[in-house]
């Protein structure tokens, strides 16, 4: 059985070796429920990634949180790192996966 890889444990050079650019990459943003979370995620993503994005939203069972998944075509590792940082700055966001 293959061993699971935790991306946090890998240095950036290793992460670059795992990904071949350009590649499809999905971000999942989890935040406190608010109506404009999807619009904020799309706006930030479009600043840093070209092409269409098709956000998918899911609300938690108690309605407290929303998760927004969004796909991009990543051109390089710096783009991925920048998006992680920028998406985490959105009001109410608790984590970016």
UniProtKB/Swiss-Prot annotation:
One GO cellular component term noted in the UniProt record for this chain: cytosol
Matching InterPro entries: UPF0250_YbeD-like, YbeD-like_sf
UniProt-listed Pfam families: DUF493
Disulphide-bonded residues: none
Family: Belongs to the UPF0250 family.
Protein name: UPF0250 protein HD_2015
